[in-house]
Amino acid sequence: MEIKKAAFVISNTDVRKCPDTRLPEYAFIGRSNVGKSSLINMLTGQKGLAMTSQKPGKTQLINHFIIDDSWYLVDLPGYGYARLGASNRESLRRIIETYILCREQLSSLFVLIDCRHEPQKIDLEFLQWLGENGIPFSIVFTKADKLSFSRLKENTEAYKQKLLETWEELPPVFITSSEKKTGKEELLDYIDSINQELATK
């Protein structure tokens, strides 16, 4: 699948104010500065669609983008940014959890993880929470171009092994690089396969 048209629709902090349609939604989330905006821009082919920033914690709203008039790409706030302060972190946590747990249109969640780092407690705890709540999700490793092939394999396998300590099977896993456009086709084809499956129901 190739995206032909993408446009920003709305930003808000209240799931009740999200677009009132039955179109499927695919949400992207990750720790601050994981490369989420760059990945969204890469997937849509629009360099400035999602605002990129070197300042962690920039995205603090639920951002909806309409894709080819048939589905929504949702940019969720990043999690785990300490400098926001306790009250702001709690507010963001509520926004994120309410959207994930209550938004019926959410077809799949993509959890972005910076492949340069070893398994992080905050990521593992979030993935565990998703599993416990039965949320359909995939893991998207970002910034693959920053590592050698052997180091990339080592780090991604470390995450998989950590998850298999408590899980019987792994969710879908994607390796991406916004710089090299690695993983673009695989991610979009996966979304397209879910859309086609939903269309038959």
Swiss-Prot record:
Tell me which Pfam families the record gives: MMR_HSR1
Reply yes or no: does the keyword Methyltransferase apply.
no
Q: Which organism is it from?
A: Porphyromonas gingivalis (strain ATCC BAA-308 / W83)
Similarity annotation: Belongs to the TRAFAC class TrmE-Era-EngA-EngB-Septin-like GTPase superfamily. EngB GTPase family.
The alphabetized UniProt keywords are:
Cell cycle, Cell division, GTP-binding, Magnesium, Metal-binding, Nucleotide-binding, Septation
Domain EngB-type G: from-to ranges? 22-197
Q: Does the keyword Metal-binding apply?
A: yes
Molecular-function GO terms, alphabetical: GTP binding; metal ion binding
Q: Where does GTP bind?
A: 30-37, 57-61, 75-78, 142-145, 173-178
**Protein name, per record:** Probable GTP-binding protein EngB
Return the PANTHER family for the record. Answer: ENGB-TYPE G DOMAIN-CONTAINING PROTEIN (PTHR11649:SF13), MSS1/TRME-RELATED GTP-BINDING PROTEIN (PTHR11649)
PROSITE patterns on file: G_ENGB
**Entry binding sites for Mg(2+):** 37, 59
Functional note: Necessary for normal cell division and for the maintenance of normal septation.
Which cofactors are named for this entry? Mg(2+)
Task: List, in alphabetical order, the GO biological process terms annotated in this UniProt record.
Answer: division septum assembly
* Xref: CDD domains: YihA_EngB
